Amino acid sequence: MIIDIDPKKFFQVGAQLPIHEKQALIEFLRDNVDIFAWDACEAPGVNPNFICHHLNVNPSVIPRKKPSRCLSRDHCEAVKEEVTKLKRVGAIKEVFYLEWLANTVVVKKKNGKWRVCVDFTDLNKVCPKDPFPLPKIDQLVDATVGHPRMSFLDAFQGYYQIPLALDDQEKTSFITPVGNYHYKVMSFGLKNAGSTYQRMMTKMFEAKMGKNIKVYIDDMVVKSKMESEHKGDLTNIFQILRGHKLRLNTSKCSFRVGSGKFLGYMVTIEESR
């Protein structure tokens, strides 16, 4: 359901809903449009006083600077495009004097576009493992079955909405054709990033966990035993997200549906498979 002149701005809602219920749901989502983002600039990031990713690098370790790899023309253009995008949203900063330096890795996605990552192998080796417990996937899925109405939520570039500790930022420096940069936010590929994300979500939804929401890192499902309760359940979750400035990605969210994909399983009111 498109909600704006811009066709990129839309909500995915239950196809089987009666017209009047569907329209009421759209109006409800429009009233809460501030918790969604269609561009990274619209995601201000979570307050670092609430959550911040720390590397905890062993101070006795000698920093490693990798020599620059030779990139193909296509890969070079992909990296430059990624740098431009990340600079625009304030996710990276140019660095001149550094001790750690890593290379970029460019891989082709299924849609034919390029994914640019940073090879943090050396850095990750000297970071201790964060033992924060992740939920059991089978238990989460089983607990979702049996609910007539569900909404599946996904944050907009959720990892980038988590700040990286100031003392650790320069350790994430990487080489590009247009200079060296470091991350200001938690990047994919950093050790313990998943644990930090889960810690944030567990802390954020502490009062709701086990009730009307299930969370596994960046996958969320809001579930209601009664259809009449679902709007109220969503309202509560939206208020928490709004309070922490965590923005959602509408293209990966679906609202008030009877079934959906959760952690690789198709979940319905009757079963998961």
Identify the residue ranges that each predicted region occupies.
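Retroelement reverse transcriptase polymerase core
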Residues: 2-273
